[in-house]
Amino acid sequence: MNTIFTFEMEGVRLVHLGDLGQPLTAEQSTALHEMDIVFVPVGGFFTIGAEEAATLVESLPKARVVIPMHFKTDRLPAVFPIASVDKFAKRMENVRRIGSSEVTLSRTSLPNSQEVWILEHA
């Protein structure tokens, strides 16, 4: 069981896919069709991995910002069984490493086409 959260603030619709561990159902895909920003797990093991995440993102063309999450960082122990964000990033186009753990967004500041934004861990 997984919970998907959707938020809308000041005209920007955000979707957080939680600990998604399987492909979206047709019903979920339809419900999530309109979004501006999507947070996607990419680390595998506990969630979908890089390939599944990339395929999922390709099915969400209206998401203008994709933010990968639930991946290995240098702050996790080496024995933690999830992958880094690199395999996902190599599979995607328009990847930006933000260099911060925070971004400020508005409807007018969203990119015109889909971009992947890799944030630093907090």
Protein language model annotation of sequence segments:
Residues 10-12, 39, 89-93:
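N-terminal start-of-chain detector that recognizes signal peptides
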Residues 65-122:
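Binuclear metal-ion centers of metallo-dependent hydrolases, dominated by the metallo-beta-lactamase
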Residues 26-29, 50-53, 78-82:
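Conserved strand-to-helix beginnings and helix N-cap segments that scaffold or border functional pockets
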Residues 34-40, 44, 50-71:
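Proline-aspartate-enriched helix->loop->beta-strand connector
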Residues 1-33, 37, 45-48, 99-122:
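Core dinuclear metal-dependent hydrolase active-site scaffold
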